[in-house]
Swiss-Prot record:
Pfam families the UniProt entry points to: Antimicrobial_1, FSAP_sig_propep
Organism encoding this protein: Lithobates palustris
Protein name per UniProt: Brevinin-1PLb
Lineage, highest ranks first: Eukaryota, Metazoa, Chordata, Craniata, Vertebrata
Disulfide bonds: C64-C70
Record's GO cellular component terms: extracellular region
Length: 70
């Protein structure tokens, strides 16, 4: 029973190390993007949610100021 626990624990740790190495490799590949189109897509992904969040905050205030029905 004890040896089974040790081997399962070893497999678990080896699996987590393998996952972390794969994630680091994936991150390194994402950093190596040199094409401007791919870089623009990444910029859009970062800024579109920010713009949408700001619009969601300010649109009700602007609508309230225009219609004066607050």
């Amino acid at each position: 029973m004890f040896t089974t626990k040790k081997s399962m624990l070893l497999l678990f740790f080896l699996g987590t190390i393998n996952l972390s190495l794969c994630e680091e490799e994936r991150n390194a590949e994402e950093e190596r993007r040199d094409e401007p189109d791919e870089m623009n897509v990444e910029v859009e992904k970062r800024f579109l949610p920010l713009i949408a969040g700001l619009a969601a905050n300010f649109l009700p205030k602007i609508f309230c100021a225009i219609t004066k029905k607050c």
